[in-house]
Design a protein with these regions (language model features):
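N-terminal helix-rich structural modules
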Residues: 2, 30-213, 230
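Bacterial N-terminal signal peptides that target proteins for export
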Residues: 2-14
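Bacterial N-terminal signal peptides
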Residues: 13-24
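Active-site-proximal, well-structured secondary-structure segments within enzyme catalytic domains
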Residues: 155-156, 187, 194, 199-232, ...
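Active-site recognition of the HExxH zinc-binding catalytic motif
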Residues: 463-477
């Protein structure tokens, strides 16, 4: 979930199932039973907003019952019973939210996406309330630390610190303000992302402005009836332009349009988000939001973070300056009018320099990669590296272009995943791994999805293949 308390809580809690499995497997199994039952349905392919609302009611009811049960616990507190119940509650929040977020970012029906976004916000709001629950905090605080192994003791301490950073020790009025601010931060963040997702763009270019583009790209981008080539902000439309368009003004036009997605709409949204984050930090006793979000991180403070970046800059600058000088000198041989390299020059000039210096032609490299070949190669790599056997998974999907797969270790099923890899209207327009179900040994198989935007047909840029492999690494992890 996007609010700070629950996100940090979930990260630290992910390891607890393995910790508890070695100490009290029976108690752990019972503790997760209700959560697993609630999360067993996987209605990602819904076409009905009312069905999303009904599913949301089930999730919120289940989360509410688990919360009430944990808050009402009495007697001796233990890791095996109480922390398992807490972790199961967090898993329900995380997985329920992941389910709704996936629907909100992938469904082709705007009403379904809106219903899922609304539910995601409701789950996030409930997560904030749980992150400020004094009864839960008091129950976790009552778990004896004596005799705990090192990992369990660390995890428990991390949870309690997260609660305190979230404001659990504040008075009722302050906690109510925190809850409201977290709600507004979530809503604003969702709106910011939705504005980018929904701005598909329509950049018009004359065919002659697209000199240098690979033939397979030109074949897929024919002029419309008005004589212009129309480009969206989808990666398969714009990224090859940055790399291959020989006319500098074309690269500038496309990169400027792409970089200004959701502007000016998001200008006010971002301002609101920054203001709300600052207000939250001040309410919690911090100087600013940067101080708040680094308080429980390894870096420790904004000052140390800035120092780390300064040190990295000092170390990297000589090499970067040498690379820039070489690329600028080369660029002037291509276009003598260039006095300095702009962002829209980098990919194009690097491609030309690699071609001259190393005989590596990016346009030729493209011809070796299509999506199907890249997918087959990555699946084979997983088999060669890990002995993984990836098989088709017969399950409903939310679009005809989506494929579903199961991951086996020998004959043992260890994971499931979806590949939603090509652009379409209303879909998330970047590349990411979406967690949908958390693995619980013996009870729940982990499920994830790759949501990307690669060309459905024709050639892929090598950088697309790198992105595919990068995101698939997250999925396997």
């Amino acid at each position: 979930m996007p609010n700070r308390a629950s996100k940090s809580t979930r990260r630290a809690a992910l390891s607890i199932a393995l910790i508890l499995a070695s100490t009290a497997p029976a108690a752990m199994a019972q503790g997760y039973a209700d959560a697993v039952a609630l999360l067993t349905p996987l209605p990602l392919a819904t076409t009905d907003a009312k069905a999303v609302d009904a599913r949301c009611t089930d999730l919120l009811t289940g989360i509410g019952k688990a919360r009430a049960a944990l808050e009402a616990r009495t007697g001796r507190a233990t890791m095996a019973a109480d922390f398992t119940a807490y972790d199961a509650l967090q898993m329900t929040i995380s997985d329920g939210g992941g389910e709704m977020y996936t629907v909100s970012q992938t469904n082709s029906d705007a009403a379904v996406r809106t219903a899922a976004e609304t539910c995601y916000q409701k789950i996030s709001d409930l997560s904030t309330q749980i992150g400020l629950s004094r009864p839960i905090y008091n129950r976790l605080s009552a778990i004896p630390t004596r005799g705990l192994d090192k990992a369990s003791a660390f995890t428990l301490a991390k949870m309690l610190t997260t609660y305190r950073l979230a404001g659990v020790d504040k008075d009722d009025a302050t906690r109510a303000q925190i809850t409201q601010l977290q709600k507004e931060i979530t809503e604003t963040g969702v709106q910011f992302g939705a504005n980018i997702r929904d701005d598909k763009g329509d950049m018009t270019l004359k065919p002659e402005e697209l000199a240098g583009m690979p033939q397979d790209w030109l074949d897929a981008h024919k002029p419309a009836a008005d004589g212009f080539v129309h480009l969206t902000y989808d990666y398969p439309d714009v990224v090859p332009v940055f790399e291959f368009a020989s006319i500098r003004a074309t690269r500038q036009k496309v990169l400027t349009g792409f970089s200004n997605r959701a502007w000016p709409k998001n200008q006010a949204v971002l301002k609101t988000l920054l203001e709300k984050r600052y207000a939250l930090a001040r309410l919690l006793g911090y100087t600013d939001y940067a101080q708040l979000v680094t308080a429980d991180k390894m870096i420790g403070s904004p000052e140390r973070a800035a120092g780390f970046l300064d040190d990295a800059n000092v170390a990297a600058k000589p090499g970067a300056e040498a690379d820039y000088a070489e690329l600028l000198a080369f660029a002037k041989t291509v276009d003598p009018s260039i006095e300095r390299l702009e962002t829209w020059d980098n990919s194009y000039m690097k491609n030309l320099l690699r071609k001259q210096k190393y005989a590596v032609d990016a346009a030729e490299v493209r011809q070796y990669f299509t999506y199907d070949k890249a997918r087959a190669g990555i699946f084979k790599l997983m088999g060669d590296l890990f002995g993984a056997d990836i098989r088709p998974w017969d399950t409903p999907v939310w679009d005809k272009s989506v494929t579903a797969w199961e991951l086996y270790d020998g004959q043992r099923l260890i994971g499931r995943f979806y590949l939603d890899m090509h652009p379409r209207a209303g879909k998330y327009n970047h590349a990411a791994q979406f967690p949908i179900r958390t693995g619980v040994e013996g009870q729940q198989i982990p499920v994830g999805a790759l949501i990307c935007n690669f060309p459905a047909t024709g050639a892929m840029d090598h950088r697309d293949v790198e992105t595919f492999l990068h995101e698939f690494g997250h999925l396997i992890h």
